[in-house]
Amino acid sequence: MKVRASVKRICDKCKVIRRHGRVYVICENPKHKQRQG
C-alpha cells in the first residue's frame, strides 16, 4: 500500500474507489495499491 498525496491509475485494471472519505486505488497487481493521505 503506497500512501500518496495524489493517487493515479497506473494500469487499465486499476480502479479508483472512495471509502470512508479516503480515496483508494485497487488493482489485480498488489504493487498498484494506493491510498490518499
UniProtKB/Swiss-Prot annotation:
A GO term (biological process) for this protein? translation
**Where does this protein have coiled-coil stretches?**
none
From what superkingdom does this record's organism come? Bacteria
Give me the comment on cofactor binding.
Answer: Binds 1 zinc ion per subunit.
Cofactor(s) required, per the database record: Zn(2+)
GO MF terms, alphabetically ordered:
metal ion binding; structural constituent of ribosome
Q: Where does Zn(2+) bind?
A: C11, C14, C27, H32
> A cellular component term (GO) from this record?
ribonucleoprotein complex
What InterPro entries is this protein classified in? Ribosomal_bL36 (IPR000473), Ribosomal_bL36_sp (IPR035977)
Query: Which keywords has UniProt assigned to this entry?
Result: Metal-binding, Ribonucleoprotein, Ribosomal protein, Zinc
Q: Which family does it belong to?
A: Belongs to the bacterial ribosomal protein bL36 family.
Quaternary structure note: Part of the 50S ribosomal subunit.
**NCBIfam families linked:** rpmJ_bact (TIGR01022)
Family annotation (HAMAP family):
Ribosomal_bL36 (MF_00251)
Q: Which PANTHER family match?
A: 50S RIBOSOMAL PROTEIN L36, CHLOROPLASTIC, LARGE RIBOSOMAL SUBUNIT PROTEIN BL36C
The protein's name in its UniProt record: Large ribosomal subunit protein bL36
Q: State the organism named in the record.
A: Thermus thermophilus (strain ATCC 27634 / DSM 579 / HB8)
